[in-house]
Structure formats: C-alpha cells, structure tokens
Amino acid sequence: MKKLLVFVMLLVATIAESQAQEHIDALLNGDIESNRYGLTMRSAVKRDPATGKIIKRVVELTASDDKSLAKEFIAAFKLDRNTAEAWDENEGGTIYNVTAVWLNPKRVYTLATNGSMITVIAQTIYREEKNNNN
C-alpha cells in the first residue's frame, strides 16, 4: 500500500510539473501570425563551451498595436498562476505586469503590457553557470 501511495504522489507531482506554464508556452511555441503588426520574436541559447549542453534559453516576444495578443497572454499567465512557485503581479488601468517563477528547471517568465504594447520574456535556466573567477 505504501508503494502505491508513493507512486501516486510521484505521478501527481510529475503531472503538475509538466503542466506548469503550459498555456504561456502554447502561445510562445504556437504559430503566432508573423504578419501581425509590430511583432518581433527573438531567441537565444547559452551553452557550456566544454560540454555543449544548454545552460540557459531566453525567448523574447514584443508586439505593438496588438490588444488581442496582449489579452491572450494575460489570460495565459492567469491560467498558469496556480502552478507557479512565485508570482508578482501589478495591474492598473491599461498596465499589467507579472513575473512568474517555476523551479526544476528554473523558469522565469515576465509579461509587461501597456494597452496594445506587449513584451514577454521567457527564461529557462537548466543549470547555474560556474563562476571561473576563482
């Protein structure tokens, strides 16, 4: 019975972790129409020079004059809120800013909107960088 209970607990934890930030990622990884006015998407990957393994991945999306996309991201962030380990949100008028943090691997997602202007930054840190200044 104990083995079954441990298995179920691990299964629930794994499912919860796999569902973290799924709505945000669906928007970032989906086919956002490239012909939307003022949409820019950039991505960068930092690798360990010795092993070639990914240390950090950053995706940045910016858009201007796109209220519908801003609303989609606000909704996605709010849907993923219950899976975040940390959440900082500021809202007032046409401004909405939120930073959400998930662990294992560490993910820091930031959304900043001001009316129809939007910026989303998604950072995934797979492992901390070694400090070579010793």
Cite the ranges covered by each PLM segment:
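Flexible, processing/modification-adjacent segments and terminal tails
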Residues: 22-34, 131-134
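Mature extracytoplasmic domains of secretory-pathway proteins
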Residues: 49-96
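Surface-exposed, polar helix/loop patches in the mature regions of secreted/periplasmic/lumenal proteins
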Residues: 81-134
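N-terminal targeting signals for Sec/Tat export/insertion, comprising classic cleavable signal peptides
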Residues: 29-59
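Generic structural signal for short, solvent-exposed loop/turn connectors between secondary structure elements
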Residues: 21, 67, 79, 105-106
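Bacterial Sec-dependent N-terminal signal peptides
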Residues: 1-24
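Short secondary-structure junctions and interdomain/linker hinges
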Residues: 15, 34-35, 80, 84
